[in-house]
């Protein structure tokens, strides 16, 4: 059941429910799911998870069946949370992206006090990435033994949907939009992307916009990260930028992302939320993984579904727990997965009851 767009409070009916698909994967997937379920149980509402097995074991014997189950679940419910999956014969992320027609990926990256980092500046950016095209759609082919070639594609519709999402987000955040590509070199492909971004910008007179060359943006982001808030880019540029930004805040394990598909009127039709990290097979099953990104992804899901107060409280609670030094071993702390999750629940309760010192 989708929440409305109004800011919700903790004064909800206990009968209010949220149904979502839950895509289980590999490695630490089960531990991340347990953390998300534990947090969901503390919310003043009922959350119903509808599980789908996307593990490598099932995909080895029934890959098509696993993807069909995932597609049926998200099309019925409209929203899903996904945990890390192993890439073997195919990338499950790409398969799902193609089946669900995901054209936009949104990755927020924000400095968290208390996380050791080699970067002294403050990062608080939203990376909006076209989820298709670029150099990722064509693996290319060899020409003889000494050369290879691949085709790079930029399409108008995904460029429009990513740009519109970025401008809607900037309007909500009251900030400007930077579109970034190599439009002076890739004049046809990146030129089309920037052309579409300009067309969308013209329909948002209240949102400032300018284009920057992607390589220059990387340098300026490091030198003056506070100058950037919403950045929209083609596929591979957004991929590079997302990981670089997570490195600037000290850990790729602190990144969550959302993937979206849209109807003909530009409204979000399907949404999937996932932690950015991998399956971490070296620590799987030990109960010591960091669930922060999975919890942040769940917070994004709650906000998307209209439960803005709850989603915001959860996102803030993750940051509160880490800032207070209540962290897992990868961030220098001593807590295990569930110990950190419990600290997040305490911080979330304090946020929702107004007893936290802001």
Residue ranges and their predicted role:
Residues 19-25, 80-83, 176-183, 296-303:
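Short glycine-rich or small-residue beta-strand-to-loop segments that form or flank ligand, phosphate
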Residues 21-42, 144-215, 227:
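Glycine-rich phosphate/diphosphate-binding loop of Rossmann-like nucleotide-binding domains
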Residues 26-29, 78, 128, 166, ...:
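Buried hydrophobic positions in well-ordered alpha/beta secondary-structure cores of metabolic enzymes
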Residues 59-149, 236, 240:
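N-terminal glycine-rich phosphate/adenylate-binding segment common to multiple enzyme folds
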Residues 138-139, 143, 147-179, 183-187, ...:
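Glycine-rich phosphate/pyrophosphate-binding loop and the adjoining helix
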Residues 222-326:
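Glycine-rich phosphate/nucleotide-binding loop
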